[in-house]
Amino acid sequence: MNIAGYIDHTVLRPTTTLADVENCCREAAEWGFAAVCIPPPFVKRTKTILEPTDVKVATVIGFPFGYSATEAKLAETVLALVDGADELDMVINLIALRMGDWDFLERELKLALEIIHSKGKIMKLIVESGILTTAELETACRRFGPLGIDFMKTSTGYAEKGAELDAVKNMRKWLPPQVKIKASGGIKTYAFARQLVEAGANRLGCSASVQIVKEAQNG
């Protein structure tokens, strides 16, 4: 398994520096990761660094808690696209989800999707599967999957739980086949990364990416 091709090499700490991002880009180019996932202020610089490579530039919207006003999320989305983002990982409004306001969530998602897809870019919807009930996760998959999202992503990495095998398996069962899955949060070893892919993950959000690939190479 070419695990590197599944990885979004991630640096999203609140204290992230330009040097951190530049190092992330160098590692991504060297190891052949699918994308880097970096904070919005660094998108333009990252795009310039990675222009000669096949590595995609991913960033986050409404991160990490998702309860920004819709207008703020859409403004972030537009700016990220202008700066050169290829993929946008948007956090769902968990307050609205917990209150059962599924219609609001669908409206917000459709507005973001319209902007992102009009530029031919990729949307990943972060749902924080680790803090949802099984019923909430199933409803999210069945309602949002058919709307045109490209990926559903398990976690921000800031909740109590990150990627879990059962969640990925359930998401694969409940989502339309064309919707991919990104597992993220707490992926530290090649063994776990491989298990997640075998469970149905198409992409992995990792900060321990180099360590994981080295483990894979060493068997």
Predicted features, each with a name:
Residues 184:
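Short hydrophobic "strand-cap" motifs at the C-terminus of beta-strands
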Residues 38:
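N-terminal beta-strand-loop-alpha-helix module at the start
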